[in-house]
Regions:
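Enzymes that bind and transform nitrogen-containing heteroaromatic metabolites
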Residues: 1-247
Length: 247
């Protein structure tokens, strides 16, 4: 058992093998049974930054990365925004554990999705690209495609996309791993059920635009923004693992 991993809330304090190993996700959204249950998992510095030199991969510890894989094993699909994929090479798969691989879902507005170069798990898990009609069609033949109609302002209907994920692709539990614009879109539209947040014991600083925060978008209206409800706290050294309900 790894030493020093403590569940400190809810009480009583106890030592655990790893955060979140025993959780099971509901099969439907909190307030809409036509939607999957959506969780967001992010790591931030103490001063709230989610990237360092444009990348998120160096923020969390080895335990944070293991925790990320634990959450992936609980979900039917893992979703990221295309900007996150463009920023660095990454994998959305599980380790070679023998478990079924989650569906990899990439959300794009432009169709600029470097699957072959930046998705390390490309070829060993099914990939679905979601985007406006023209942008998504650019990816046909390289991945499965879910093409969406857009509003006059160009916004995609993420609620309809989530409904399609559940109805067509059998996604009951969806894990979202950023980036900040996708997080903001989901939270501002009340489409995210829970937030899993790792606080890395680092201070990064940075000017606006140099180091992103967890949510990038307009200020959330006070009357409709979620009021996160703390569900659990794990402590490993100086690293915190927080779980919140967003409903």
């Amino acid at each position: 058992m790894p030493e020093g991993i403590l569940q400190v809330y809810p009480p009583p304090t106890r030592e655990v093998d790893s955060p979140y190993a025993d959780i099971e996700l509901p099969s439907t959204g909190s307030h809409d049974s036509s939607l999957p249950y959506v969780i967001i998992n992010m790591v931030t510095s103490v001063d709230g930054r989610v990237t360092e030199a444009g990348k998120a991969s160096g923020l969390g510890s080895a335990l944070d990365r293991r925790t990320m894989r634990t959450l992936r094993s609980k979900a039917d699909a893992v979703m990221i925004g295309a900007g996150t994929l463009r920023a660095e090479r990454l994998s959305l798969a599980l380790d070679d554990s023998g478990l079924p691989q989650p569906l990899a879902v990439i959300v794009t507005e432009t169709g600029e999705v470097p699957l072959e170069s930046n998705l390390a798990s490309y070829g060993r898990q099914t990939v679905l690209v979601i985007g406006p009609n023209q942008a998504a069609e650019q990816l046909r033949g390289r991945a499965s495609v879910l093409a969406l109609q857009t509003s006059p302002s160009g916004a995609m209907d993420l609620r309809e996309a989530l409904r399609s994920l559940k109805a067509t692709y059998g996604v009951n539990g969806l894990l979202v791993e950023g980036g900040p614009r996708l997080n903001h879109s989901l939270i501002s539209q009340n489409l995210a059920d829970e937030l899993f947040l790792t606080i890395s014991p680092k201070l990064l600083g940075g000017l606006p635009g140099e180091a992103l925060t967890m949510l990038e978008g307009n200020l959330l209206p006070a009357e409709t923004r979620p009021a996160p409800d703390l569900l659990s706290v794990y402590l490993a050294g100086s690293e915190l693992f927080l779980r919140y309900s967003l409903f």
